[in-house]
Amino acid sequence: MKRSNIDAMICRQEKITDITRETINKIQLDKLNAVLKREKERQGFYRDLPERLESLDDLKTLPFTTESDLAQKGGRMLLCSQGEIQRIISEQTSGTTGAGKRVFYTEGDCEHTIELFMAGLGEFIYPGSRTMVAMPFSGPSGLGELIADAIRRIGAHPLLTGNNKTYGELKTILEEERPDTYVGMPTALLSMLRMCGKGSIKRALISGDACPETVMKAIEKILGTPLWPHYGSREMGLGGAICCQAHEGMHMRENHCITEI
């Protein structure tokens, strides 16, 4: 079995030849301590945290950052100037009337996201593929745009479908554009397959929403191939983890995110 694209991406980004748990732990601790030191020097939002941790186990002594923190004090968390911000995603938390949380991305953050999308999508999208991108398109550096950019860099062709097409419009795209791959939310994909047929679609990545096992099995039965689930959130730069060709779990972008499961 070949190495997953995400593992290869991490090796390339960190200039290492192989991934071991010890290597990942060192990368994570070194990067975390660099951020803590920089934050202590600039007296920002996290100024009261220790300047250095001796091990990743020390993370359990640190307080959580809450949605309220992001909404009320997100600007103070920046480690760059406002002029370096390329994209801001705002979200109004349900049940509240106050300020929504805001997550900021620099050009470098967006580039890392594109590289992750290239690694994940590159497991099943090939040069020349035609891919329906049924995700929100909200302007430069939005989710749909970043996915489309990653597909172009692979050498494939993104169809900027968006997430608000009618079944009639989707059927027209399937018949006229003949996509072989699909990126979108699981329930929307299942609805399209049931209402419009699968057309020429052979493979699909699902993201943006939880996917119950019953929905996953129903989609896989129609397509006749395993799904490629992706996990991400705004706080982790939109991209977090995706399965590889073994389909036995997900690979995290562990050089950028520390996860607790």
Predicted regions and their residues:
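Acidic/glycine-enriched edge-of-secondary-structure segments
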Residues: 97-112, 148-149, 155-157, 172-180
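Conserved ATP-dependent adenylate/AMP-binding module captured primarily in the ANL superfamily
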Residues: 114-130, 166-178
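Nucleotide 5′-phosphate-binding alpha/beta core
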Residues: 1-92, 99-112, 119
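Hydrophobic alpha-helical segments that mediate membrane insertion or helix-helix packing
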Residues: 93-97, 151, 259
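Short glycine-enriched loops at secondary-structure junctions
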Residues: 87, 110, 136-139, 187-188
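Active-site glycine/GP-rich loop and adjacent strand/helix microenvironment
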Residues: 1-23, 27-30, 34-35, 157-261
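Conserved AMP-binding loop of ANL adenylate-forming enzymes
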Residues: 121-156
